[in-house]
Amino acid sequence: MSRYDLVERLNGTFRQIEQHLAALTDNLQQHSLLIARIFSLPQVTKEAEHAPLDTIEVTQHLGKEAEALALRHYRHLFIQQQSENRSSKAAVRLPGVLCYQVDNATQLDLENQIQRINQLKTTFEQMVTVESGLPSAARFEWVHRHLPGLITLNAYRTLTLINNPATIRFGWANKHIIKNLSRDEVLSQLKKSLASPRSVPPWTREQWQFKLEREYQDIAALPQQARLKIKRPVKVQPIARIWYKGQQKQVQHACPTPIIALINTDNGAGVPDIGGLENYDADNIQHRFKPQAQPLRLIIPRLHLYVAD
């Protein structure tokens, strides 16, 4: 497929996402809102976009005010729709839930509508990340040449739909991206970097090359069977825990965007019990279960690369 055809499909798919999101928000407003509970988080400024989040103050919104915030959030796709001071790199998150009363027919209609939106979002992401054939660093410029100001993460994010929950509880998740590597795999990566000299601020090209050589020597000095692990922290994420009484099971969802809960009164479902979201405080985290951590020694800080002792 030619690059021109891909751009045509990219623009066409995005227009469909916008149209279907507009239709969905109109459709939802035609349904009876049983309960809405949304939690807005502080705006991340451009100056603080890389700063660690040690505390997050939550503001609760209820009823029609919460619904209006959520429906606007679903269609928040461009930086032009937000304050100039807000970071365009830090993801805008709005945890919470909207609960609508449905019958069998309207439930199926909304399920199909949301499924179609999520299919389009997945297709759009596939075009950008795979079909474009571009490395991650070049994708930003390519996408924004054709869709100026697009917040790609908001375009990728699918909508979470649940049916007839009994209880909904919100919380925070601290996670790490973990990847196990062999010594030879790390050496191969460093060798590629050494073969393509460049400057990385605040280092000059020569300083960066020297830094890479030191890192290569440190890894090469390890035993061949050394166990290496990338353990990169991810910013704390809001989550929702859903309990289904009939199935006697709990399901956990990431909750960067308000969940849509359909309550089918034809089947005798009732309004769920919805909890709040507490302020986040990194110094006051309570772990339900924290397994014994494997002893690790940091060996390349910039890569978050550790070696198991």
UniProtKB/Swiss-Prot annotation:
Keyword Transport in record: no
Pfam families from the UniProt entry: Ter
Subcellular location: Cytoplasm
GO biological process entries: DNA replication termination
Alphabetically ordered keywords of this record: Cytoplasm, DNA replication, DNA-binding
Main localization, broad class: cytoplasm
GO CC terms of this entry: cytoplasm
GO molecular function: DNA binding
Family (UniProt): Belongs to the Tus family.
Role: Trans-acting protein required for termination of DNA replication. Binds to DNA replication terminator sequences (terA to terF) to prevent the passage of replication forks. The termination efficiency will be affected by the affinity of this protein for the terminator sequence.
HAMAP family: Rep_term_Tus (MF_00483)
Protein name as it appears in the record: DNA replication terminus site-binding protein
Protein's organism: Salmonella paratyphi A (strain AKU_12601)
